[in-house]
Amino acid sequence: MKKIRLFCFFAVALLFLTACTPKPNMETLLSYQAPGTEMTIRITDTETFYAKIKISENEASIIFTDEKREGIAYRMDRDGQICMFFEDVEIPLASSDELKCKDWFALFSIPSGDNIWKIKSETIGGINVYVCRDEKITLYIDAASGLPLKIETEGIVIDVLEAHKKSADG
């Protein structure tokens, strides 16, 4: 009888250990910020805007797609310099500290090691997601694809409506 109990205990313990998969770290979860990622987003920040964000090797671009702002785009390079575009006109912005788009760009270039993150695995609306929280930011990342679903911080909500991450081979 003792052998059966011991066997059952080890079987349950083994089952429990194999069922628990480790959570990925923030570096892995933030890999959607790599070059080649394109997203259709809805930004809610005092107003609601629709845009596409494209992340390349040296810069990120936000191209507005809503009727009111269609054709206007902002591009920020890796040094933090922002240019505004409309059709073929490029306007470098000397002081971009007060621009709201700088806050939006920051949400797509979050450093993984600077913050203490709490990572929780949840099921929301039938989708397995990682909910990642630090002092200011909450990220909802699709567990299957590794792409963000929603980003929230200090009055800004970015809903990712569609996302694509290009593979290394194109």
Model-derived regions, located:
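N-terminal leader/targeting segments and the immediate start of mature chains
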Residues: 14-59, 89, 95-96, 165-170
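Gly/Pro-enriched, hydrophobic low-complexity segments
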Residues: 61-66, 117-170
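Short, surface-exposed coil-to-beta transition loops
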Residues: 47-50, 69-72, 134-137
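Sec-dependent bacterial lipoprotein signal peptides
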Residues: 1-19
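Well-ordered beta-strand positions enriched in small/hydrophobic/aromatic, beta-favoring residues
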Residues: 39, 74, 130-132
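Small/flexible residues
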Residues: 5-7, 44, 77
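An acidic-aromatic
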Residues: 52-106, 154-159
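Flexible, processing/modification-adjacent segments and terminal tails
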Residues: 25-33, 84-135
